[in-house]
Regions:
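The feature marks long extracellular or luminal low-complexity segments
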Residues: 1-150
Length: 150
């Protein structure tokens, strides 16, 4: 019987039994993106290896949309700013994801923006129309909207 541990919130069976040829198969699962160190121990001997888990792009969602700067002049050049954060279903940041952006009331935004390594992206909004503009960030079937004022 071999004892098994794993770091970074990864899950393993606490013990596994050797096959007739002396090998074991260790199944490691995780909902946390990143590197997990898996250690197998028997008697006073142990070996460790790193395994890597990546965020699940299939479950990309807009986890957060926050207004960073509001109340800019309606001059078509001075921007209000929002920050969107994209994660998978387990809250792992997703880099390199394309977020669709819309704004109403005549406001102008880039139609798509791409997330940074931490899963965030800044959205700049300009307008020549004074008033409230709803800004919507979307990915897959997930979207959030926030109002900004010019």
């Amino acid at each position: 019987t071999v004892s098994v541990t794993a770091g970074n919130s990864a899950t393993v069976a606490p013990t596994v039994t050797t096959q007739p040829d002396g090998t074991v198969e260790i199944i490691v699962t995780s909902q946390t993106a990143g590197t997990s160190t898996v250690t197998a121990s028997i008697n006073s001997s142990s070996q460790s290896r790193n395994v890597t888990f990546v965020a699940d792009v299939r479950t990309a969602q807009i986890a957060d949309l926050v207004v960073i700067k509001d109340g800019s002049e309606a001059d078509g050049a001075t921007a209000n700013t929002l920050r969107a954060r994209v994660t998978d279903a387990f809250g792992n940041a997703l880099a390199g994801q394309t977020v669709s952006v819309l704004a109403d009331n005549g406001a102008t935004v880039a139609p798509t923006v791409t997330t940074q390594p931490d899963g965030t992206v800044e959205i700049s909004v300009t307008s020549q129309t004074a008033g409230i503009s709803a800004v919507t960030a979307s990915i897959n079937n997930s979207s959030l909207s926030r109002n900004v004022t010019f």
